[in-house]
């Protein structure tokens, strides 16, 4: 890292470490304001800023109010998060900074004393996890989310096949391999400018974590069916389900945010999908939903959640969420799941999912729903995936984690309505 890159990183961290805005939004805004920054500059700034987020527990132990000392925070991130030797950056340092980094390296063993610093997790989250996990499980989780995430992409089966697309990417020197579970997935260990790639522009490829691809498999949409994506967002899972249906049948994509649904429309066009009807709703109780009561073959609820399964990509979330925000989400999730269940026809399927690792948002939410809705029963996810020739057994629920499965942390439950 050179002096100019360090200066830019410090300016980014001064804003990012207040945790008032999503980190990716802060970074994008900064790069828009500094259009002359080259590709390598942006890479160095982004990697160091995200290293500061991943190692914020240790940095905040060494520095009071890191956002008020962003240059030191950036230097600490280089040493703690990017394995930079002090000798490599000695020309950037004054005497005080050299002493600070020397003390920081000397304190590395001290940082392992507290579970929150050892796992790089805030105290509130450690306390939540301690209700269900052992100390070793918490430490393993902390290690897994501090690893950079690969880029997973999905082959749109309307436009191509994985066994044809994969060799093309490998021929371009992309470090590409088939995902181990999803039959449509490709994993890129080295990120490329996919949004400019011909196969992305023509709709053959779509960015999507393997966990989300498996969720689309669990929905099990068939041609000619009525499908509801109750919390569609920008529509990544909607598109995967649509490809399964080959434009035969109808998908209703609902969301409360018009902006997110607006992003779905160009993606539909690029993917060659014509059977998706997107509509903004005011809430899960919107009267426009009532017309589908008891008519849907499949209903997907990718519920609003804490997002704590995505910490590899969004390390700031653990500081932007709290026990209070999670508690508020629980009632919202329950209300949405209850409302969505009314759309499912007899023998139809209701799939509940989150990108959280907290049992309160996951298993406990499903157990509460089943206790209130005896007309539904749980379908074993492992058996369902086995029937789809997916060799993955996480039990009756789909539970994915970054350490074991190299995906985002993910949860799903499949519920079937009885006759």
Question: What are the roles of these predicted feature ranges?
Answer:
Residues 1-196, 295:
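Class I Rossmann-like S-adenosyl-L-methionine
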Residues 163-419:
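Rossmann-like S-adenosyl-L-methionine
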């Amino acid at each position: 890292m050179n002096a100019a890159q360090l200066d830019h990183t410090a300016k980014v961290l001064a804003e990012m470490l207040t945790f008032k805005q999503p980190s990716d939004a802060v970074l994008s805004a900064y790069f828009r304001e500094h259009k002359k920054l080259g590709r390598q500059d942006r890479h160095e700034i982004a990697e160091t800023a995200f290293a500061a987020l991943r190692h914020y527990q240790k940095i905040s132990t060494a520095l009071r109010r890191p956002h008020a000392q962003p240059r030191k925070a950036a230097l600490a991130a280089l040493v703690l998060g990017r394995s930079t030797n002090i000798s490599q950056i000695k020309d950037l340092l004054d005497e005080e900074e050299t002493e600070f980094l020397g003390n920081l390296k000397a304190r590395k063993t001290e940082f392992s004393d507290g579970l929150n610093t050892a796992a790089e997790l805030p105290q509130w989250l450690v306390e939540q996890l301690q209700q269900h996990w052992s100390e070793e499980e918490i430490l393993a989780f902390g290690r897994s989310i501090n690893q950079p995430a690969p880029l997973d992409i999905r082959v749109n089966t309307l436009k191509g096949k994985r066994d044809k697309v994969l060799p093309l990417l490998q021929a371009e020197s992309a470090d590409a391999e088939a995902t181990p579970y999803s039959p449509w997935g490709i994993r890129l260990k080295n990120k490329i400018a996919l949004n400019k790639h011909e196969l992305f522009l023509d709709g053959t490829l779509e960015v999507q974590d393997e966990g989300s691809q498996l969720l689309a498999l669990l929905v099990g949409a068939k041609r000619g069916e009525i499908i509801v994506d109750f919390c569609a967002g920008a529509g990544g899972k909607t598109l995967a389900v649509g490809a399964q249906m080959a434009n035969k049948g109808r998908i209703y994509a609902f969301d409360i945010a018009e902006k997110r649904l607006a992003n779905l429309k160009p993606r539909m066009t690029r993917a060659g999908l014509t059977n998706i009807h997107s509509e903004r709703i005011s809430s899960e109780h919107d009267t426009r939903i009532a017309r589908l009561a008891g008519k849907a073959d499949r209903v997907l609820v990718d519920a609003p959640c804490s997002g704590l399964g995505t910490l590899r990509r969004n390390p700031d979330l653990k500081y932007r969420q709290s026990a209070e925000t999670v508690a508020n989400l629980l009632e919202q999730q329950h209300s949405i799941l209850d409302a969505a269940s009314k759309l499912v026809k007899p023998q139809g399927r209701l799939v509940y999912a989150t990108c959280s690792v907290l049992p309160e948002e996951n298993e406990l939410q499903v157990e509460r729903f089943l206790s209130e809705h005896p007309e539904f029963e749980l379908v074993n996810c492992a058996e369902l995936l086995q029937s789809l020739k997916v060799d993955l057994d996480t039990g009756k629920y789909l539970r994915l984690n970054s350490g074991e499965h190299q995906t985002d942390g993910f949860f799903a439950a499949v519920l079937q309505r009885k006759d």
